[in-house]
Amino acid sequence: MASSASSLHFLSLTPQTLLLPKPTSQTTSLSFFSLPPSSLNLSLSSPSSCFSSRFVRKVTLPDFDQIEDVEDGDEGVEEERNFSPDLKIFVGNLLFSADSAALAELFERAGNVEMVEVIYDKLTGRSRGFGFVTMSSKEEVEAACQQFNGYELDGRALRVNSGPPPEKRENSSFRENSSFRGGSRGGGSFDSSNRVYVGNLAWGVDQDALETLFSEQGKVVDAKVVYDRDSGRSRGFGFVTYSSAEEVNNAIESLDGVDLNGRAIRVSPAEARPPRRQF
């Protein structure tokens, strides 16, 4: 066929009777009924892409208006499939030019990708540097996190985390902040007065790096980097909790001004946290 899609048109027929004469005296009549003008479209398109079985979304913030392309060939699909939150993966530190197709192609190496979302700013239309990938099973989620956390995509090391943000502690003075990788290391209660504030952190520093550095000065009960709940990016500061006040003093004296990933960190008692600087 010359074109990629063809249409067969049915003409409107008015009620009428067609008489067919026969050798006998009897006649046979065939009745035709009125049909409204209509068109039957037969689409001849190119083979479906490798992402034809999933949704690929472009989501804008802050009110999450979205444009949704359903690429499974079924024009009757009106509602998005619901997936378990356990199957959703956060992907941060994306290059602004990275789109959902690039993410889908990458994460398919770890399993079947059900849906991909890249978050865009509604006003500027630019990517906000993070998105979400939904896999088919928990095993694939674990495989993707292990395989792609720290993976370099277009020159940037991805941050890949699974599951919902951890529950916030009631005694926390920073309840508005949510970390995709947080929570108490010790699994028990601790004295918040033995906590130090750590500022001027490089964006790539995570809680593991904090714990490694601060464990040189004592027993680290808890280490946390604070992340922005919308972008998923580090806010450039965090907290470390020790088991005693003596360890807190040692950490402040020894680590304040120490270079960590190219930046001189600021260490002070959490209660006397200095105001944040703009970088």
Curated annotation (Swiss-Prot):
UniProt tissue specificity: Expressed at high levels in the leaves and seedlings, and lower levels are seen in the stems and roots.
UniProt xrefs under SUPFAM superfamilies: RNA-binding domain, RBD
Stretches that traverse the bilayer: none
Domain of life assignment: Eukaryota
Cellular localisation: Plastid, Chloroplast
RRM domain mapped to chain residues: 87-165, 194-272
Keywords annotated in UniProt: Chloroplast, mRNA processing, Plastid, Repeat, Ribonucleoprotein, RNA-binding, Transit peptide
GO cellular component: chloroplast thylakoid membrane; ribonucleoprotein complex
Region of interest called Linker (Gly-rich), as start-end residue ranges on this chain: 166-193
GO molecular function: mRNA binding
SMART domains the record matches: RRM
Region called Disordered, residue ranges: 156-187
Predominant place of localization: plastid
UniProt cross-references to CDD domains, sorted A to Z: RRM2_NsCP33_like
GO biological process: chloroplast rRNA processing; mRNA processing
Function: Could be involved in splicing and/or processing of chloroplast RNA's.
Protein name from the UniProt record: 30 kDa ribonucleoprotein, chloroplastic
